Amino acid sequence: RVSSTFAPRLANSSISSKTFWHQDMTYWKGDPNKLSVWISLNKVNKQNGSPHYIPGSQRKSFKHIVKGKGKIPLLEAQDINESEKVIIEADIGDIIIHGPHVLHGSEENVSGEERYAIILTYQPTTDISHHRSGLPELIKR
């Protein structure tokens, strides 16, 4: 069984700094069998903060430090080979799916326009660590 905590985090990236490189498992608890589903609500490009990934990073180990907004564990830049970075541009409704160990972040939004995305987390129904109290849950049986 798989569930999604229907806490669609509405990622609003207005004029802002970039999102540091990170792996979701550095701040997720419980079962590592989770997936993030990122749904673009408008066109995403380099100017408005497109996401970026390092292919194969889920098979590597990275040193984490506490850095950035919210004190979420993020990666030290020197641990990352930026030449391997793949920037993802997306259209409205495009979906990006990644596992908890995939290294990712986003570019700085310098467009002057806001960028929105909905982020869902899918996880085993036995894992209550990522559930948010008071929010509906979707379950596939």
Segments from the language model and where they lie:
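Signature of the catalytic double-stranded beta-helix
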Residues: 1-7, 29-32
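A structural signal for short, well-ordered beta-strand segments and their strand-loop junctions
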Residues: 1-5, 50-53, 97
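Short, compositionally biased segments
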Residues: 4-17
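Short, well-ordered beta-to-alpha junction loops that form the rim of enzyme active sites
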Residues: 5-8, 56, 100-102
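A structural signal for short, well-ordered beta-strand segments
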Residues: 6, 37-39, 118-122
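Catalytic core of non-heme Fe(II) oxygenases with the double-stranded beta-helix
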Residues: 15-87, 127-136
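Non-heme Fe(II)/2-oxoglutarate
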Residues: 50, 64-71, 92-97, 101-141
